[in-house]
Amino acid sequence: MRKSEVVVITGASAGVGRATVREFARHGASIALIARGSDGLEGARREVEAAGGKALVLPLDVADPAAVEAAADRVERELGPIDIWINDAMTSVFSPIKKMTGEEFRRVTEVTYLGFVNGTLAALKHMLPRDRGTIVHVGSALAYRSIPLQAAYCAAKHATMGFYASLRTELLHDKSHVRTTIVHMPALNTPQFGWCRSKLPRKAQPVPPIFQPEVAGRALYHAAHHPNRREYYVGGSTVKAIFGNKLAPSFADHYLARMGYDAQQYDGHEDPNRPDNLYEPVAGDHGAHGVFDDRSRDHSWEFWGESHLKTVLTGVGVTIGAGAWLWHRCTRPTAAERAASKVRSFRNQVVRKVA
């Protein structure tokens, strides 16, 4: 990657965004950091600079389209032309629908869906005239398969998927060299489960299996540099959720009705008075990880296979070819066997003539 690559990451202060910042910083990118929390943004800035990169801190709410557009303009002025824009910022409410308010649904939608729209429009403003650039969306298995207790977030991710599909189709129609892709994530060990608003009786947790945010960061880095693929799936659980729902949606409804509540909670009563980030950021630098390190996986073999598809297919082809060659060698008669066969054939012919 060339040193001048300019990357914008929303939700950069913590979780997946923070892990993605670290991944791009490791490769020498100049990174514009967008989020609301100033503590986390400053922590991310220090990490970028420690890795030898350049960081531009832009504290703002992605639900504000004017602020996002102004931020993109500033990135172009101070860092240079935007090469990659990653839409990651999100918020959620853990709650049964019957306990939520319309205002809570609106807020989750504004950040988790319209925040992606605002980021995309700001990026396109600069990318389309020069006919280059890449926009990457952080998707989710929940963009295909909704679960109980996260209706607002699931609906926002479904909306994001619909928006993305329209965007990609229009870019293809226009024969644009601006690329876009989406990366669907599994359950991740991020701080969101300790700061998103919750109305659950017990503490919220990601539905196992849980993956570390670095898995997501590596996937987003790869997708940003290989954006021609329509979708990427991270984790076997993501693949199962998406395709299982396509095959048997009614079964999935009943299964999640039985299992989906306990799977999203763990021991310990939730504090109803703890601060949440629905409207304001939670103070402090929370980094990339949540509290589930002891239960989290640091690798996704499914994504590795998907992102190295040519290597996998080549390996399969070589294995099949080698097996066929060995089979041919093992079943092919030796020189001695061929000579003996000719002798037997000649002898049989002589016997028939004599007879």
Residue ranges and their predicted role:
Residues 13-14:
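Conserved glycine-rich cofactor-binding loop
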Residues 29-43:
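Conserved glycine-rich Rossmann-like NAD(P)H-binding loop of the short-chain dehydrogenase/reductase
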Residues 60-70, 102:
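The beta1-alpha1 cofactor-binding region of Rossmann-like NAD(H)/NADP(H)-dependent oxidoreductases
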Residues 96-97, 101-106:
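Substrate-binding pocket helix/loop in short-chain dehydrogenase/reductase
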Residues 120, 156:
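Active-site helix of classical SDR
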Residues 140:
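Residue(s) in the substrate-gating loop at a strand-loop-helix junction
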Residues 172-268:
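SDR active-site lid
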